[in-house]
Design a protein with these regions (language model features):
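Short, conserved catalytic or interaction motifs in soluble domains
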Residues: 26
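Bacterial N-terminal signal peptides that target proteins for export
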Residues: 2-12
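C-terminal motif of bacterial Sec signal peptides marking the signal peptidase cleavage site
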Residues: 22-23
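Glycan-processing catalytic domains of CAZymes
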Residues: 35-442, 450-477
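N-terminal secretory targeting modules
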Residues: 13, 31-34
Length: 477
């Protein structure tokens, strides 16, 4: 009996030791990669354009694509941009889609077809502008067959990606202006193109203007545009570095937050505009430029990266080619360098090089962002907090899944990437490099993509050395 008791005590001691050993081993495990509360996979809302490479490739668009001038004035030669040389220049910048140019199929069919041919050659998708189609907005009884009879002229080109519909449609209560683009008339044609013919249509909304007076009207405007046109992609053009805005970034973020929320409600993506220069000249006036030209590189990068952190699944640069009247000056006659990735005389401006660098980075991260769902944004630091005070998508806890805290002046976009945590970290400062520190709830295996270069680390804490305005992608493996 005594021997039996000793045997049971021995077995009990061994069992207790095994429990303690197992418990200690569990404490040392990666508490992130084996979490029971990891996210379920969600379907991304990104639009897939097969010619660009499908859903893994982010549309990087140019607004005002190649057009034909081909004449001389004041000792300058204004070239024909619809050539191999300029399409190669566009491709080298990382642009893969042209959504609008001054070339209209109704007036210049041979030039539109040349654009499409060069698009095929250089891997650049084209949205076609055709007044033969757009003029049908005034016909409420227009049929799919009538529209298809026009599209047959160019829709077989592999580079044909859709139709240009309208830029900044107007309403009777918001930005009526000349009344030439009143919203209601676009509903029928949009339905025929998008629903009946499955053609992607390009349309772009006004930004909020004079928000103090127009906030409710603008919200109504966005809702009505969506109900009327039923867009497959939501676009708007807010340029944060226009001098008259006086650096009020809270309105920039409010507008983007509204677009993000609206896109989420309608289960569509949003594409954001990035300003390639400034000092626009819609009124075709002669004036001298402010210098230095703006935005500078860190401001430009900040513009792109904050949009990506909020979940943008398309980037649009305006203008790609500088319109002739955007170069009008007073004392010097012309200024080819104050706006446009490419100036009127074919010169590469500073924003060409900024965009080229940024687009290389996007090409290294777009598979993740295009297959992710944005779950909100963490802000860290006083300036970022002040500027996003009107923003509804902020994660107030400052934590997300395995991420427990962020230190530094930063924005962190939080994403569900096929059930994994992805984070897009932005140095919020446009003036200074910073160390941004992220702390996790256990040892994590982290893929880092910075300056288009990939690296891998394991750790509970991560310190990122980030240039002003820079964005870095993290994926927790």
């Amino acid at each position: 009996m005594e021997n039996r008791c000793r045997k049971w005590k021995c077995l009990l001691s061994i069992w207790l030791c095994m429990v303690l050993i197992t418990g200690c081993a569990s404490e040392g495990k990666n508490t992130g990669s084996n979490r029971e509360d990891r996210m379920e996979k969600e379907e991304s809302r990104a639009v897939s354009i097969s010619f660009l490479g499908g859903k893994d490739v982010m549309p990087i668009t140019g607004y005002i694509g190649p057009y034909q001038l081909n004449y001389s004035a004041d000792g300058y030669t204004f070239p024909d941009y619809i050539t191999d040389e300029y399409f190669q220049m566009i491709a080298d910048a990382g642009i893969n889609l042209i959504v609008y140019s001054f070339t209209d199929y109704a007036n210049s069919p041979e030039l539109v077809k040349k654009n499409l041919e060069l698009g095929e050659q250089f891997g650049i998708g084209i949205f076609v502008t055709d007044s033969n189609v757009l003029d049908k907005v005034n016909n409420e009884s227009v049929t799919a067959d009538e529209v298809a009879a026009e599209l047959v002229n160019y829709s077989d080109y592999a580079s044909f990606c859709g139709m240009y519909l309208v830029d900044e449609p107007q309403t009777t209560y918001y930005q009526t202006r000349d009344g030439s683009r009143l919203l209601p008339k676009y509903g029928k044609l949009s339905k025929v193109l998008q629903k009946d013919l499955d053609i992607l249509c390009y349309n772009n909304l006004f930004p909020v203007i004079n928000m103090d007076q127009n906030k409710e009207l603008y919200e109504r405007y966005v809702k009505e545009v969506c109900e009327t046109i039923q867009p497959k992609v939501l676009c708007w053009d807010f340029y944060p570095f226009d001098s008259w805005r006086e650096g009020d970034m809270s309105v920039y973020f409010w507008n983007m937050d509204l677009m993000r929320t609206t896109a989420e409600e309608r289960n569509i993506p949003f594409w954001a505009f990035i300003q390639a220069g400034a000092q626009w000249n819609d009124d075709e006036l002669k004036f001298d430029s402010e210098t230095p030209y703006y935005p500078n590189e860190s401001q430009f990068d900040w513009n792109v990266n904050t949009c990506l952190a909020f979940g943008a699944q398309g980037i649009q640069y305006f203008p790609l080619f500088q319109p002739l009247h955007f170069a009008y000056a007073e004392s010097t006659e012309w200024d080819f360098e104050r706006n446009g990735m490419i100036g009127v005389v074919g010169n590469k401006n500073q924003w060409y090089y900024y965009a080229q660098t940024m687009n290389k980075h996007i090409a290294a991260i777009d598979e993740v962002l295009m297959n992710s769902v944005n779950k909100g944004v963490i802000v860290s630091g006083k300036q970022a907090g002040d500027d996003t005070k009107m923003t509804s998508c902020i994660i107030e806890s400052g934590s997300f899944q395995e991420l427990k805290s962020v230190t530094g002046d930063a924005l962190v976009g939080c994403f569900n990437y096929n059930g994994k945590t992805a984070l897009y970290v932005v140095n919020y400062s446009m003036e200074y490099a910073q160390k941004i520190i992220l702390k996790f709830d256990g040892t994590q295996s982290i893929k880092i993509v910075q300056n288009a270069e990939k690296s891998y680390v394991n750790g509970k804490n991560l310190t990122l050395d980030m240039a002003a305005g820079e964005g870095v992608l993290l994926v927790l493996e």
